[in-house]
Amino acid sequence: MIYGALGDIEEYRGMLKGLDVLIDWLEENDPAELEVGSHPILGDKAYANVMAPTTRPEAEAHYETHQRYHDLQIDVEGREAFKVATGSLTLVQEFDEKDDYDLVDSDASIAGDLADDKFALFVAGEPHMPTLEFPGDGAQPVKKICFKLLADAYWEE
């Protein structure tokens, strides 16, 4: 996971091809202007999924993992918490190749949030649990963007 202030994202240029594409896009575009839905940035190599969910308690969620895509997530309205699994994993739902995800539970984690213009980049294969209730807020609406960035290993397919 890479976690920091969205305004500092340029520091991560050169790490991942898809991240470089997104950094270039962010220099020219305001993500808050995107409507709910899917928006291509560079075909299926980089795109934005804009969602308007309600945050949920951890007890109602599982960790998700992806094989082909990294997820870079931001909140443009509201705020959410997230967790990243650090312990042993228990499979909850088999991998769905079409939608590139499986669900797992874990016995240990670290936590963060996407308040105050922060971002989190969850790398492919990293179990993460987004869209959790921000501490003390309860369930709240949030407008968020999950930028899907194709992992370098699949870039030339």
Question: Each PLM stretch: what is its role?
Answer:
Residues 42-43, 59-71, 88-93, 107, ...:
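A short beta-loop-beta micro-motif enriched in histidine and acidic residues
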Residues 36-57, 68-76, 84:
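A short glycine-rich, His/Asp/Glu-containing loop-to-beta-strand
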Residues 113-133:
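Conserved metal-binding segment of the jelly-roll/cupin
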Residues 70-74, 111-112, 119-120:
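His/acidic/aromatic-lined binding-pocket segments of jelly-roll/cupin-type domains
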Residues 67-80, 86-88, 94-104, 148:
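Short, conserved beta-strand element in jelly-roll/cupin
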Residues 1-50, 60-62:
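A short, N-terminal "cap"/entry segment at the start of jelly-roll beta-barrel domains
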Residues 79-83, 127, 153-154:
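Short beta-strand segments in beta-sandwich/barrel cores
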Residues 119-121, 138-155:
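A short hydrophobic beta-strand segment most commonly corresponding to one strand
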